[in-house]
């Protein structure tokens, strides 16, 4: 988990060219700690947060026990790396990654995934992101990608808005079995992130944009905030275990706006986001061979 954080940190600094990550080491009173790294006001990334944590305690919170009641009464150990990148250019999508490992007495599992949230959609980008993650999944089990892609579509869904957060990716949780094989799978998925995302950044970060595109980006960032504060399991877990609030909320965008009863104009790129890209579909099959 720490090497994943290290690799992504160094590559993102190279891509940004100006911004540098500031590291903040922290300890949790109940046990464990972590290292948060944040880049702000970079050339490419307006904010980029990459966190590693390794915490332990006497009992798991209700949000976990609802899913794994057999873990009740056992001390727990959790480690993981999470990341959210908020680019400056509205044509570059926001991206999220999280991979984690839980252990509570005799119970253990892996979870995580990565998903893409564009503001202005490009089929080429969505297809590339999904195809890269699919290849990482297929190397371990051809049933993984369709299963975890569907899970991602269902998980990153704003029920109160009745719309997906973005074009998805993969998501899995409470996965058990052969420890070594599942660990290797999670490792492959983590290593697939940079080749899945950086080509998109390189294609889009120099595209010209104006106030209209910036305002729409800030408006759509509001959906990110809503999901993270209302539905996200990681946020809920952190709050229920007395996690470090600065690290928990590091994923928030630096600027955001809400509009009352916003409706995109028909025939615009903004409308296309809703009509095409916020509709779950088989993106991987649309990748160029």
Curated annotation (Swiss-Prot):
Substrate binds at residues 82, 98-100. Residues 224-259 are annotated as: Important for dimerization. A divalent metal cation binds at residues 86, 96, 130, 160. Its EC number is 1.3.3.3. PROSITE patterns: COPROGEN_OXIDASE. The keyword Nucleotide-binding does not apply. It catalyses: coproporphyrinogen III + O2 + 2 H(+) = protoporphyrinogen IX + 2 CO2 + 2 H2O. Keywords: Chlorophyll biosynthesis, Cytoplasm, Heme biosynthesis, Metal-binding, Oxidoreductase, Porphyrin biosynthesis. Coiled coil: none annotated. GO terms for biological process: chlorophyll biosynthetic process; protoporphyrinogen IX biosynthetic process. The record marks 160 as: Important for dimerization. SUPFAM superfamilies: Coproporphyrinogen III oxidase. Pfam families: Coprogen_oxidas (PF01218). Involved in the heme and chlorophyll biosynthesis. Catalyzes the aerobic oxidative decarboxylation of propionate groups of rings A and B of coproporphyrinogen-III to yield the vinyl groups in protoporphyrinogen-IX. Belongs to the aerobic coproporphyrinogen-III oxidase family. Homodimer. This is Oxygen-dependent coproporphyrinogen-III oxidase. The lineage of its organism: Bacteria, Bacillati, Cyanobacteriota, Cyanophyceae, Gloeobacterales.
